Amino acid sequence: MMLEGEFHTHMLPEFMIERRQDRCIRCRVCERQCGFNVHWYDEEMDMMREDEMKCVGCQRCAVMCPTNALVVKPHPGNYKPNANWTRERLQDLKKQAETGGVLLTGSGNDKPYRIYWDHIVLNASQVTNPSIDPLREPMELRTFLGRKQDRLEFKYSEDFEDIEITTELYPNVQIETPIVFSAMSYGAISYQAFKSLAMAASEFGTLFNTGEGGLPKELRKYGKNAIVQCASGRFGVDPEYLNVAAVVEIKIGQGAKPGIGGHLPGEKVTLPISVTRMIPEGTDALSPAPQHDIYSIEDLSMLIYALKEATNYEKPVSVKIAAVHNVAAIASGMVRAGADIIAIDGLRGGTGAAPKMIRDNVGIPVELALAAVDQRLRDEGIRNKASILVAGGFRCSADVVKAIALGADAVYIGTPALVAMGCTLCQKCHTGICNWGICTQDPYLAKRLNPEITAKRLVNLLRAWSHEIKEMLGGMGINAIESLRGNREQLRGVGLEDWELEVLGIKGAGE
């Protein structure tokens, strides 16, 4: 049980605030900008003061200070050094002793697991094959997501001038870049942030994922760029919701919290969110850990084809899972069950809220999962029957290029999009207080995010990454993204063990 009444915490502050009094003009901007009530004005002393115990390090006050009077940095106070009992472990124990609760956190896994992208390098053309200048020659990043035919058959006219495809084509979705916005639900993020993603995806010609919280009626005009989720809570799912979208995704798992469900507290379920999710206002939105109609591959197949039936077989159906130990076998079953797209969310996938112990200890890196899945599907001769979307830890365009060379068709990005909006990874998404207006339902905080401006920032990010991808493709002498897909000869490992190179399916540098 949580300690009540007056008691003195045993925890140390996480951050310290340095205030240049010679620069501070007592404008109280820092006080107004901080939703955690860190700053306050001392009338008697005519100076600003701060409660460092409340500071989460979001940097909003420092960024908005008109005189640059504030510096927020990690607190130097520490316990006696101990290799086994780090500061973080001690702080976590003390917090649980005071609250009696599960430790919650936001964002993705921040532990020092090996980041395989940083141990993989790309190839470049030298002498024997020419490189391509993307500024002067066309480069193709257009990607099609969905099941592909084994072969195409054509019917020719007698004079061979007219050609007709006789093969029945599966529904595919066209995107102009192999980058898609990850699932972030309305409720977990603000309406303004949600709308920004929709607007940016629509403008650039890619997709955004609604998450499991439904799609507001007024934003369904962006449906042709939406991946809508059918998750365990079935929030917001109705025929219109399914048919307005480009892709329907069955959410089985999430990289940040494999094997558990979700919980949106009632205080976040405002009237607009309750209408979108189709639940009473102010009630907790609980997503069960499993989908209670899926306990086998056969059950999954039934839901896949039920959704295909509901959408008149006009939408690709995706199935999203967390990257776990037997991910390759699971993915094979998903494809055979009828999934047109398989989405794999890795160990570093972000979240609005997750138990810290699960986020930091459950699942495997997406690099290894992707390589294993792509190889398994190729070995079984079914790779063309589904596209592979991967998520969880993509930080830059080079990560995207390496993922495609490992076998991905496209990647989800979540945290980079949030950072483009203003996020500083303070990891307090679960509190409902976000000084940048992203992960909050507080109208005062949410209005800080202007969808028109934020959408432009997101479009700029997509444009910059896409141009960098073209530069890297050109350097390899490749002019179309599809020629890179699964082309592991363009990759080499640096500083990796033999077993890691084997799983990744790449050679060591110099080979």
From Swiss-Prot:
Cofactor requirements of the protein: FMN
Protein keywords: 4Fe-4S, Amino-acid biosynthesis, Flavoprotein, FMN, Glutamate biosynthesis, Iron, Iron-sulfur, Metal-binding, NADP, Oxidoreductase, Repeat
Biological process (GO), any one: glutamate biosynthetic process
Organism domain of life: Archaea
Residues the record lists as binding [4Fe-4S] cluster 1: 24, 27, 30, 65
Coiled coil segments of this chain: none
4Fe-4S ferredoxin-type domain location: 15-44, 46-75
Matching InterPro entries: 4Fe4S_Fe-S-bd, 4Fe4S_Fe_S_CS, Aldolase_TIM, GltB, GltB_archl_type, Glu_synthdom
Keyword Metal-binding: yes
Broad class of enzyme this protein falls into: oxidoreductase
Catalytic reactions on record: 2 L-glutamate + NADP(+) = L-glutamine + 2-oxoglutarate + NADPH + H(+)
The enzyme's E.C. designation: 1.4.1.13
Matching Gene3D superfamilies: 3.30.70.20, Aldolase class I
Cytoplasm recorded as keyword: no
Pfam families in the record: Fer4_7, Glu_synthase
Positions contributing to [4Fe-4S] cluster 2 binding: 34, 55, 58, 61
Molecular-function annotations in GO: 4 iron, 4 sulfur cluster binding; glutamate synthase (NADPH) activity; metal ion binding
Matches recorded under PANTHER family: ARCHAEAL-TYPE GLUTAMATE SYNTHASE [NADPH]
Family under the similarity heading: Belongs to the glutamate synthase family.
Protein name: Archaeal glutamate synthase [NADPH]
Organism: Archaeoglobus fulgidus (strain ATCC 49558 / DSM 4304 / JCM 9628 / NBRC 100126 / VC-16)
